[in-house]
Every structure is written in structure tokens, then in C-alpha cells.
């Protein structure tokens, strides 16, 4: 007794998905508005497992969304605002066509708008969730803040992104949360630790750039609209945690120090305060004046399940972080006009240093180049005409490398005109079996407090090789004489044997050798491991072989890189010798 036969494509996966066109018609939105709505709400297309079933037997390429997501969008208030805006544009176009200017003004005053506050609260229920997703928001805001004021995007969006990015940088400076910096071809990567969350973002270089034509700026603008709202919420909450005034204001002392004689020459009166904030050279005002108190040393007790060693490691890391936060304390920097001012000022201020620049370069300079208390003058040119004796003249890379190394590196390798050492990425963490370049080994030795003698040893080896080459000719004659004597002795021994004269045989009493327990233990472990491998199941043996193959491949690659580096070093040494001989 069979029941009613089910019709095709009326149950299962065929009813769980909906095409983009059907979804758009269901919401009564244009394609552009539908795309905006999906970006704002975080709805994305899905790829069904059985396309043919979903598409009712057809194999045509289509975009599918989950039906429950589209039903969820039906109750979104922004959908109504999109429809209101569509009606507003239609009415405005009619008013322009009829030249009814009073109606145009009235319509512009009543232009429909919407807020994304409820969407932010919906997508990020807790503040930590928002912090975890703030990386892309920061990268997009920093990108838009560098755009020129062209027709590609609204001026208000550029100004908003600039304001939010300056607020973020000022917070990082006040909390001293920056941990790593890396200069790449794409831009400058920063990594900060905010409330226990690691946040990484990229900032483009301050170069004039042409807008590419193959980029959809409307999609980017929609993402920016969401990200600016998110970043505004995050900045407000972070400023509250540090008891800072929001929107940020300079404290009284900082405002006095940045008081320029001719501020109108730098910026308009309405923009001068924003420019002073973006200078990053003064501290921010607080709601309640902070009272400096001696930090009491608290007793640390291991938590449940945490042993003493882990607690000691954690304490050591905390000490390193507190030491890194004060890396540039007591140092005064002066930036020459050719160096990246904003990036260097941001990094130096994050670690407690003071920074200034020429008055004609930008608003916000706090002291002149003639100040005798300046300790480091950052220059990016081969030489300088006028130099002061009581300061170091270094290249900008010293600041970034010192931050990544968590110590003040020796300045000798960063003087003017000196070939800089390689800028190593702080985001690479070497594991067992990986290739570690000599520069990284030298840096690790400096971090341990050792003085690496790598360069001196190389120079000594070079000198020894030259001495050996000179002495080889002198030693050849003595070696020939020794070989001749050995051949004569062997000939005499052969003659004695042939004449029947046996050599004297001596028997020495044997001695009991002490057993090497460490070696015996290692052999026992190796035997146990071999037996364990033999007892493995087929599946486990396959996985084990794959793991060992991966480890061996990693070792081979590391050896290959080490051989390449050795060949490169040998070639550079040979070139140096040739140059010396020519001289």
C-alpha cells in the first residue's frame, strides 16, 4: 500500500536554496541594493552539493543563497530605507526636470537615511567579537584615508576614515599596545595586542597612486560604510577603558607645546586641531587626571591545572613586554624631511620616545633640530653637511628592527651610507628543522645578551685563508721530503720481511672498558621505537610515514637553503679578495 508519490524538486535540497534573481525579486530590490544588503548583513552565497537537483535538472551556472537567509532579510528595517531612497531619487529627478528648485531643496532636506548600529550589535554580540573582526576594518579605513579627493568615493567617507584611523593610532600610543612592525612591498604591517586580542593591519605607503579601473569601488564603499560604524564603536569603548576623553582631545600641556606661531599657514582653522591630533606628537586628555603611583608587586599563584614552570614562563613574558613598552623611553628623535614621518612618529611614540621634525614639514613639531638633548637623528640620505657630535645619525630601519628585536640594536650597522642588514619579518617563527638565516641567529644572540663575533670571525677566516695561500708554497717542499722518508722506511720493512726477520710482537694486558650508560639507554630507546613502528597498524604506519616524509623534506629544504647561503657568502668573499688585490 503505497502513499502518494512525491513530486520532483518539491522537497530536500531543492527547497533549501534560492537563486539570486528570485531572492532579489522577493525583496523588491535592485541588484546593487541587494548586494549592499548582503554585505551589510553578512549574507553570502552557498554552493549546493547537488546543483542539478537544486536547479530542477538544469546545469546552468547560477548563484544560490540559503532560503532561510533571504527570509531573515525580509524583516530587515534597512530594506524599507532602500525603497524610500529609490522613491526619493525618482522625485528628485522629476523636480530637477521641471526646474522646481524649491521642491529640490525641500527633498534634499528630507533625504532618507539609515543607521547600522543595530546591525553591528547583531553581528557582534560581545565587544571581544568586534575586536577579533577589526583587522579588516582597520586595513580598509587606512586605505580609504590615503585616497585623493576624486570622484571615485565621497569626500565625507575619506575624512571619516582619516579621523577614525587617527583615533586608533592615538589609542595604541596611549596604551602602548604595539608589538611588531614589518615593512613590505604592499605596505607597513602593524601588530598590536589589545585586551588580549592580537590585531594585525596594513597601512599603505604615503605615495600618490592611480586608481585601478578593474576595482568595483561601490562594493568597497559598502564595506567601508560597515567598517567605519564598527570602528567608531570600538574606538569609543577602548577610549573608555583608558579613561580618555572621546572624541580625543589634547591635554593642556600638549596643546601648549603644539601651539604654532602661524597655524593658518599649515591648515584652515577648522582643520588645525585635527591636524595636531594626527601629528601623534602629544598626549591625550583624560576624564580624570591620572595619579602616578608606585606599582605594587602582587604575589602570583598558579591557577588550577597550571604548573610552576608555565607560571614562570608567563611571568618572564610579562617582564619582557613591560620592558619592550619602555624601549625608547628617555630618547629624543628628530626626523628629517625625507623619512616616512607618520609611521616613525607612531612607532616611536608607542614605545615611550619623544619625536619632532622641521616646522616647515608639518604641524605638531615640539622642538627644533638644534636642540642639544636630541639623541637620534633619523636620516635617509647618503650624507649630511652639518652634523652634531652629541647624537647618532641613523637610517629609519633601526627603529623598526629594534622594535621587532625588543632591544635597542647597535647603531653601527645603521649609520649614514652603510649597507643595511636585511629587514627580517617578525611574523616568521622558526620551528625545529627550519632554516634559520645567520642574521636571525645573530639577533637571537643579541637578545640573549651575548656579543656575536660572527663578522669578526669571518674577517679572521678571510685573513687566515690569505695567510694559508701564502704559506702553501712554503709547506709543499717539506711535505715532499716527509713523503720520501716514509717511502724509504716502508721499503726497509718489506726487505726485512722478505729475509725472514720477523718483527717483535708485544702482548699488552687487556683493560675492562667502562660501559657508556647514556649510549646504552639511547640504543634501548631506538630499539623500542623500531619495535613500536613494527607493531603499528597499516593506517597508523601510513600516517607515520607521511609525517616522517614531511620532516625529511623540511630538512632537505633547509639544507638546500643553507648550501645556497654558503655559496653566496663564498662568492662575496671571493669578490672582496679580488677587489683587495686590484687595490
Curated annotation (Swiss-Prot):
CDD domains: BRCT_pescadillo_like. PROSITE patterns: BRCT. Its main location: nucleus. Residues 323-416 form the BRCT domain. One of its GO terms (biological process) is maturation of LSU-rRNA from tricistronic rRNA transcript (SSU-rRNA, 5.8S rRNA, LSU-rRNA). Disruption phenotype: Embryos exhibit smaller eyes, a reduced brain and visceral skeleton, shortened fins and a lack of expansion of liver and gut, and die on day 6 of development. It is found in: Nucleus, Nucleolus; Nucleus, Nucleoplasm. GO terms for molecular function: ribonucleoprotein complex binding; RNA binding. Residues 455-489 have a biased composition (Acidic residues). The keyword rRNA processing applies. GO terms for cellular component: nucleolus; nucleoplasm; PeBoW complex; preribosome, large subunit precursor. Keywords: Coiled coil, Nucleus, Ribosome biogenesis, rRNA processing. InterPro entries: BRCT_dom, BRCT_dom_sf, PES. Residues 275-329 form a coiled coil. Residues 448-526, 558-583 are annotated as: Disordered. Belongs to the pescadillo family. HAMAP family: Pescadillo. Component of the PeBoW complex, which is required for maturation of 28S and 5.8S ribosomal RNAs and formation of the 60S ribosome. This is Pescadillo.
